[in-house]
Amino acid sequence: MVDMAVTPVALLEASHLHYHVQQQALINDVSLHIASGEMVAIIGPNGAGKSTLLRLLTGYLSPSHGECHLLGQNLNSWQPKALARTRAVMRQYSELAFPFSVSEVIQMGRAPYGGSQDRQALQQVMAQTDCLALAQRDYRVLSGGEQQRVQLARVLAQLWQPQPTPRWLFLDEPTSALDLYHQQHTLRLLRQLTRQEPLAVCCVLHDLNLAALYADRIMLLAQGKLVACGTPEEVLNAETLTQWYQADLGVSRHPESALPQIYLRQ
């Protein structure tokens, strides 16, 4: 009899996460997993707890109750440098007070590596994010969309390795300031990277149609609870969205992919 060994899937696992500020529950009993090689979108109305959940999943906040494990190890027990090489976070707002050039900002992502193979990493991620022409510009004078592209390049540089290992990339509204071309380019790039490497991407998105087009799974957060989780077809239906967003909307099918697309009624 042949012993068919099964390769374990690299996971980030959260179990019964709670997070309270004073007497208010911002996150309430959330359990989930994110596997390398998939793209996950977190959606939900304003105040649902999306950014707070992202900070819990990345170790920037410690839960009031519950645990979060990355590759089987509690996030709180990771060494900072090892964690920085395994997961990266692009926050919603990234203002700088000093006159750093774009290339210097992106190079900050290489801090955990001590200069190892920086040039190759920087050239690759700047090309991927359409930042080469911005390299010598002062980061502070860029448009909001240009700054988002630079921050994406920085976190990609942080996770770049010559021999890719399982890694997790978290992004908080990475397309909020981008024009249509760069929204499409960015999400195509992120999805492509999850197919080519053992990389997981988890991003908070407000645009439900972008989530439908590019995410493998969608997690709907409302009032601090994970109220729906599944494929775009499973989560993005009119009944569920109307219940939690309280908007007068409809759901149709994309003419090419047949994925759900959401529209507001007049």
UniProtKB/Swiss-Prot annotation:
ATP binds at residues 44-51. GO terms for cellular component: plasma membrane. Its main location: membrane. It is an enzyme of class 7 (translocase). The gene is hmuV. It comes from Yersinia pestis. NCBIfam families: PRK13548.1. Keywords: ATP-binding, Cell inner membrane, Cell membrane, Membrane, Nucleotide-binding, Translocase, Transport. This is Hemin import ATP-binding protein HmuV. The keyword Disulfide bond does not apply.
